[in-house]
């Protein structure tokens, strides 16, 4: 919700705002199968560590860009914002790997409850996030991005110091074929499922 206000100094048109908002989701959609495959091959911990570090980088770049004064008509800040959103979107592809960690450490009879709690946490984030961001923006419009960067950095410290490797070496798989990493091929398989098709 704060994106138009964060970008006000750049006077972007509606198309630029839409592309900037959608670039995160597109990057996440494209890389999620690859990140999942890499975690199956090399382990959960290194993949999550790299992705969380990427999130710190993407959010930090975004925060710096919207906080600095720029010459009018300059394209550089918009390019930096797109780079920041894409980096953060790629890093966001680790959500499936985080779910895999939960599956690795949870007994089958408690797995549904654990995933339910994760769903509740996501829901609370979507509800409380805009409210908290709005309150922080009253102090400074870029403050929510800086706070998010700080939380991402804290998350990275937690991952590096506390997250164990939950995917043992003898359970790891080789990388799949390129076709299996194609998100559009995966999406078509889902859509062709009779249960989904009826929806």
Regions found by a protein language model. Name each.
Residues 25-33, 93, 126-127:
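Residue-level signature of mid-helix packing/kink "hotspots" within the transmembrane helices
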Residues 1-25, 196-199:
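Helix-loop boundary and gating motifs at the non-cytosolic
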Residues 164-199:
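Juxtamembrane intracellular "pre-TM" segments in multi-pass secondary transporters
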